[in-house]
UniProtKB/Swiss-Prot annotation:
Protein role: Colony queen number, a major feature of social organization, is associated with worker genotype for Gp-9. Colonies are headed by either a single reproductive queen (monogyne form) or multiple queens (polygyne form). Differences in worker Gp-9 genotypes between social forms may cause differences in workers' abilities to recognize queens and regulate their numbers.
One Gene Ontology molecular-function label: pheromone binding
Source taxon at top rank: Eukaryota
Family: Belongs to the PBP/GOBP family.
Entry's Gene Ontology cellular component terms: extracellular space
Compartment list: Secreted
SS bonds (residue pairs): 37-77, 73-129, 118-138
Chief place where the protein resides: secreted
Signal peptide (from-to): 1-19
UniProt keyword NAD present: no
CDD domains: PBP_GOBP
Alphabetical UniProt keywords: Behavior, Disulfide bond, Pheromone response, Pheromone-binding, Secreted, Signal, Transport
Protein name: Pheromone-binding protein Gp-9
Length: 153
């Protein structure tokens, strides 16, 4: 069973290194709890943002706040079902471990630093849904930047 880290991400997590390159794919759609979380929140695949929209930040300008919140709730649901989040709180160590397992990142890897920065940026947010989507978006955006910088090097 795959775990979701922002899995991103990671989801969201996450969705993270290889998935971020498939921009038409829906965030989180490759993970086991995706369909369950869609059903629990009364959403369909059509309601979920694409990886490309999220990694580019277009989801923030192309969608209403209610759509952003609903997408975040699906992300939070998957993170929680995978033991990476409880309510609005991350299990940071488990999130790092699962992200490393998912991406193959090694200690000192810039992707891990990006995940840490994204968790730090969102850790004090109280709304679990908004927090989850912002975390996933942060990780996906960082992966794009890191991929672009490594291609240019």
């Amino acid at each position: 069973m795959k775990t979701f880290v922002l899995h991103i991400f990671i989801f969201a997590l996450v969705a993270f290194a290889s998935a971020s390159r498939d921009s038409a794919k829906k965030i989180g759609s490759q993970y086991d709890n995706y369909e369950t979380c869609l059903t629990e929140h009364g959403l369909t695949d059509d309601d979920i943002f694409s990886i490309g929209e999220v990694s580019s930040g277009q989801h923030k300008t192309n969608h209403e706040d209610t759509e952003l919140h609903k997408n975040g709730c699906v992300m939070q649901c998957m993170l929680e079902k995978d033991g990476l989040m409880s309510g609005a709180d991350y299990d940071e160590e488990k999130m790092r471990e699962d992200y490393i397992k998912e991406t193959g990142a090694q200690p000192g890897d810039q992707r891990i630093e990006a995940l840490n920065a994204c968790m730090q940026e969102t850790k004090d947010m109280e709304d679990k849904c908004d927090k989850s989507l912002i975390l996933v978006a942060c990780v996906l955006a960082a992966e794009v930047v890191l991929a672009d910088s490594s291609e240019g090097a």
